[in-house]
């Protein structure tokens, strides 16, 4: 017998082999609700990153980064003797995965370190950038996260080349595993583009045009070197990143004012990406067999373009070249489509040979800024007014690198800009004395005596708070934006009922505030949440349980002028399984949309389960449909949803294309209940059924109420960053 045959693991170690997902690829995936647990986090349980960052000597870090910029390493030499352009690309690509559709992606968790992003074709050779940073990360340790360090390095890179940045905020906390909740597309090959249908309609929520790209194909759509067609892709992709035309032009031109692309030779000379590379590569990828594989011989995108005569110094030369020459199509040494200036002198410096010069070159997507009429108008203004260009780029860069951080309350450090920006969803600071315990009790009594039902109170508070997205920290009850456009008109918020509830609560607010002295007030944002808490307490009382739902005042009311209607439109629920709502019919089944919503609310599977069961019996369905209201005691916080769902005396059959179901008595055939896929999944999915059985047991009523209250409190406070 050979040594190999004695190995007890014939085929795979723990976690190997055929998975449940392989057997049942359409199985509802609950793992996305249990990411980033303490079991994957190496930090101490009491570690507070915000406090650690506050102890950081940011000026010292920046000095070390500044020295790094011009300390070229033989193993990966700096172009033009300066790593700044490489680090700008690293920071840009860290932040640039953000998309507005679901708020996922972005720089907030340092995901560029992990698959798939660390191995995307568009991130080729950024592994070297992070390795160059390791000595600085090692020096400052846990006081600065990788997520913060990558963005800070991009800022220092810009500053080291003469550009004045708008500011920097820390506060991005690292995670320790890939984010499994982000849908990057269904393509199974790099640079695939099955995400398009019809007349180049891009699948939501995606923003990038091809699998493995951050934004658009720099050669043009699918490699077609058409600047006008490329402009269409640029406009859609950048809009899905929350950028308007001016911000888009500023970012492209600003970023391409520095450095170069790399296409010294044919891409087939590349080795595998980091995740596929051999163990001896130690996490590095794209080892090239072309020449030395680095410096003059480096290959990254396959394009070989240097935009300006000042690749390591801020200037207006990008626009000077863009408008100063006519351009003709050519190919890089790697065979990629790019453009070269006609009738031009060789004015562009070589990245590694001080004696060599090159002709000006541009990408197809650069020429879009000249030949698309709207982009051209902005570009020409920037060309003629460099100070406007510098300001626009500084602001757009700050937005790009901070968009997924949420409100300013999360910003840390001495370089946080004083100016509040509309895209930060500003909320006024608390400017009055807050209500106390006695006030809270008195307000609850007024609310419960107002004639509003438990259902109305709970529904309104849920609608206000559940807009929160843990992906980009937007939404939530703070600000009371449910009373403003666009939220007040969303179908999911039942505008007619909402107006009635708000009118009643505003009356209570006015009476209370008018009777106070000493500057004490209650905001409508607080009152909406307090009303929901009062509704939950009353529902528990109706079921025979005396509970006090936690409530902490301190929310404020935003103004319409502080609310970007277009920006907030992306928060509108297309589905909310917690309220048995779908705006339309979608490719994804309703239960998958429920899990997606739960993940954005940072809920676990047990929390999702108890909230659905509780909200059903509290009669909070949008439109007051009876689907899933498995109780004869609505507005009582009972575990009836689970008891009746698990009742084997009920037989379920589809009635409407397998989206709506009838539950009939097995013996008599009499109709007992109706339910949706979201309701029935808690009986059909083995994990969810196991949770439903906990709450459907005879001894579970008290636990059910406790767990519902805890999960409710969590959702109501998701945006209370002041309480963290």
UniProtKB/Swiss-Prot annotation:
Changes after translation: Formation of the three residue Trp-Tyr-Met cross-link is important for the catalase, but not the peroxidase activity of the enzyme.
Swiss-Prot/TrEMBL cofactor(s): heme b
Residues reported in the UniProt entry to bind heme b: 256
Catalytic activity: H2O2 + AH2 = A + 2 H2O; 2 H2O2 = O2 + 2 H2O
Position(s), cross-link Tryptophyl-tyrosyl-methioninium (Trp-Tyr) (with M-241): 92-215
CDD domains named among the record's database cross-references: catalase_peroxidase_1, catalase_peroxidase_2
Gene3D superfamilies: 1.10.520.10, Peroxidase, domain 2 (1.10.420.10)
Domain of life (superkingdom): Bacteria
Cofactor binding, per record: Binds 1 heme b (iron(II)-protoporphyrin IX) group per dimer.
GO cellular component: cytosol
GO biological process: cellular response to hydrogen peroxide; hydrogen peroxide catabolic process
GO molecular function, one term: heme binding
Active site as annotated: 93 (proton acceptor)
Cross-link named Tryptophyl-tyrosyl-methioninium (Tyr-Met) (with W-92), sites: 215-241
Pfam families, per database record: peroxidase (PF00141)
UniProt keyword annotation of Metal-binding present: yes
Entry keyword set: Heme, Hydrogen peroxide, Iron, Metal-binding, Oxidoreductase, Peroxidase
Site (Transition state stabilizer): 89
Family per record: Belongs to the peroxidase family. Peroxidase/catalase subfamily.
Complex formation: Homodimer or homotetramer.
Function according to Swiss-Prot or TrEMBL: Bifunctional enzyme with both catalase and broad-spectrum peroxidase activity.
NCBIfam families named in the record: cat_per_HPI (TIGR00198), PRK15061.1 (NF011635)
Full protein name: Catalase-peroxidase
Species for this entry: Ralstonia nicotianae (strain ATCC BAA-1114 / GMI1000)
């Amino acid at each position: 017998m050979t040594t190999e045959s004695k190995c007890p693991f014939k085929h795979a170690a723990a976690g190997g082999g055929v998975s449940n997902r392989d057997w049942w690829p359409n199985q509802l995936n609950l793992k996305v609700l249990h990411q980033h647990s303490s079991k994957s986090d190496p930090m101490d349980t009491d570690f507070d990153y915000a406090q650690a960052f506050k102890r950081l000597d940011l000026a010292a870090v920046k000095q070390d980064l500044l020295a790094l910029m011009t300390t070229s390493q033989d193993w990966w030499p700096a172009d033009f003797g300066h790593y700044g352009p490489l680090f700008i690309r690293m920071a840009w690509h860290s932040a640039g995965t953000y998309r507005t559709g679901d708020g996922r992606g972005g720089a907030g968790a340092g995901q560029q370190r992990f698959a798939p992003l660390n191995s995307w074709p568009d991130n080729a050779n950024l592994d070297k950038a992070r390795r160059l940073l390791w000595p600085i990360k090692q020096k400052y340790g846990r006081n600065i996260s990788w997520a913060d360090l990558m963005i800070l390095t991009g800022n220092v890179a810009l500053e080291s080349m003469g550009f004045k940045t708008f500011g920097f905020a820390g506060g991005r906390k690292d995670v320790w595993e890939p984010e499994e909740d982000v849908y990057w597309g269904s393509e199974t090959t790099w640079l695939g583009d099955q995400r398009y249908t019809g007349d180049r309609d891009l699948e939501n929520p995606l923003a990038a045009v091809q699998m493995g790209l951050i934004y658009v194909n720099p050669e043009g759509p699918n490699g077609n070197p058409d600047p006008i067609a490329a402009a269409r892709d640029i406009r859609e992709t950048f809009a899905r990143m929350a950028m308007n035309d001016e911000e888009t032009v500023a970012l492209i031109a600003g970023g391409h004012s520095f450095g170069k692309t790399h296409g010294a030779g044919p891409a087939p000379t590349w080795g595998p990406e980091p995740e596929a590379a051999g163990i001896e590569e130690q996490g590095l990828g794209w080892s090239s067999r072309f020449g030395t594989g680095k410096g003059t011989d480096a290959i990254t995108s396959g394009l070989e373009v240097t935009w300006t005569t000042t690749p390591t110094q801020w200037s207006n030369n990008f626009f000077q070249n863009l408008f100063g020459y006519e351009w003709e199509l050519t190919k890089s040494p790697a065979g990629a489509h790019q453009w070269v200036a006609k009738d031009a002198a060789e004015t562009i410096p070589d990245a590694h040979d001080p004696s060599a010069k090159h002709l000006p070159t541009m990408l197809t997507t650069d020429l879009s800024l000249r030949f698309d009429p709207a982009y051209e108008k902005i570009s020409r203004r920037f060309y003629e007014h460099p100070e406007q260009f510098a300001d626009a780029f500084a602001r757009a860069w700050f937005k790009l690198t901070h968009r997924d951080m949420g409100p300013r309350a999360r910003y840390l450090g001495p370089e946080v800009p004083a100016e509040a920006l509309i895209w930060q969803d500003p909320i006024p600071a608390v400017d009055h004395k807050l209500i106390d315990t006695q006030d809270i009790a008195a307000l609850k009594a007024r609310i419960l005596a107002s004639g509003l039902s438990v259902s109305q109170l709970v529904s309104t508070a849920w609608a206000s708070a559940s807009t929160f997205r843990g992906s980009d920290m937007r939404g939530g009850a703070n600000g009371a934006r449910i009373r403003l456009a666009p939220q007040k008109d969303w179908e999911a918020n039942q505008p007619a009922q909402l107006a009635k509830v708000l009118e009643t609560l505003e009356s209570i607010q006015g009476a209370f505030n008018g009777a106070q002295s000493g500057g004490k007030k209650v905001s409508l944002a607080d009152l909406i949440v307090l009303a929901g808490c009062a509704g939950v307490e009353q529902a528990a009382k109706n079921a025979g349980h005396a509970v006090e739902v936690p409530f902490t005042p301190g929310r404020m009311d935003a103004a319409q002028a502080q609310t970007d209607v277009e920006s907030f439109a992306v928060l509108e629920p297309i589905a909310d399984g917690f309220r048995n709502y779908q705006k339309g019919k979608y490719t994804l089944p309703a239960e998958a949309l429920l899990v997606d919503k739960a993940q954005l609310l940072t809920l676990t599977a047990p929390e999702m389960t108890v909230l659905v069961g509780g909200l059903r019996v509290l009669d909070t369905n949008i439109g007051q449909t009876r689907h899933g209201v498995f109780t004869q005691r609505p507005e009582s916080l009972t575990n009836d949803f689970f008891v009746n769902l698990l009742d084997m005396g009920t037989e379920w059959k589809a009635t409407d294309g397998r989206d709506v179901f009838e539950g009939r008595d097995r013996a008599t055939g009499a109709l007992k209940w109706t339910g949706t896929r979201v309701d029935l999944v808690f009986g059909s999915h083995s994990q969810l059924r196991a949770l439903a059985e906990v709450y459907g047991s005879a001894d579970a009523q008290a636990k059910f109420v406790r767990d519902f209250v805890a999960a409710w409190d969590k959702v109501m406070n998701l945006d209370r960053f002041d309480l963290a």
